[in-house]
Amino acid sequence: MYNDKSVNENHHIASSFCMLRRPECNFLCDLMSTEPSSYRQFRELAIDLVLATDMAVNGQIVKAFKSSQDAAADETTKNKQGSLMLQMGIKCADLGHLTLEWDTHSQWVQLLEEEFFAQGDWEMQLGLQPSFLMDRSKPGPSKTQIGFFNFVVFPLFGSLHAAVPAVAPMMDALNDNFTRYKQYEIVQKLGGLVWKALNKEKQDIRMSVTTKMIIAV
């Protein structure tokens, strides 16, 4: 379906326009009849925005957005810049929980992880390989946030912030949550080191006791 490209997003936008064909749902009927060019522009923009939410094209969109900010401001470029600005906006909104305070954000991550794992369970029942981050036997989204922030979140929000300074409060929230994850990672590593040290100490004690028993015999 859809040549295996952005299947979920293509399905959503195609279904939406199918619904718009119903008279009781077509709130754009006047626009379609009186301003067909405006309707075509709306349709094109709606498709671009929905397809932009596919994480597979994240890097491509961020790169195009950065390039558009340096381009000459002719009419064609302005339209493209406007579309890319909206695409960046909807992508950031799609990840909006990352900019919430920690308690709320962490709840979102847990819910997201369970949704991912539920899909992975269903894929396994169908005899399929679980999709990335959807296998319960492997680390899920909650354990991979530092990499996600570094490779996806900061480039995305940072690029928008460079063009729209008003995004600063979101960047502050992102940095706060990222710091939490880093602190958690440090605690986990320290905990692992302490556990290894305790196990080594126990092994040394057992070796010492065993050696003394052998000598006594």
Question: In which residue ranges do the predicted regions lie?
Answer:
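Divalent metal-dependent phosphate-bond-processing catalytic cores, especially two-metal-ion Mg2+/Mn2+ enzymes
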Residues: 1-217
